[in-house]
Amino acid sequence: MLRHGRPGSLATMSSSTLSVSVFDLFKIGIGPSSSHTVGPMIAARQFAVHLRASGLLAAVNGVTVELFGSLSATGVGHGTDRAVLLGLAGHEPDRIDPEQIAPTIAQIRSSGALALLGEHSVPFIEKDHLLFRHKSLPLHPNGMCFTA
C-alpha cells in the first residue's frame, strides 16, 4: 500500500483501490472564495508565528501586507482582506468561530490597530498597510509579501 498526500492525510492507494478522506478534498475556512481566504489566512498567521518564534514580535512597530495576482484583483470581493487580518490576529481558518469574524474585523478597522497573534498591538490602517498590487509575481500568479 502506498501512502500519498501530506502528513496526516488519509489518502491511501493500493493496486486496486483509492481511498480519499473528505479532508483531502475540501478545506474548511471562511468564504466566499476559500481559495482566496484559507491560504492567505494561514500565511498571515504563519508570518506572525514566525515573528514570535524569532523573538521579534514585541519589537514590531507595524506590518505591511502586499497582495499580488488574483488575490489583489479580487481580494476584497473574495474576502482576502478579512482573511489576512484574521490570520495576523492569530486565527486559523478551520478553528475560528464564524460568529467572531465580523466583530473582530470591525474592532481592527475601528481602532486602527491589530493585535498580532492577539498579543502585540501595532497600528493597522488597511489603506496604508494592506496593499493591492495589480500585478503578478514571477513564480506564482497569487503572491503575498509580508513586512514587519
Feature roles, as predicted:
Residues 2-4, 9-148:
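Fe-S-dependent hydro-lyases/dehydratases of central metabolism
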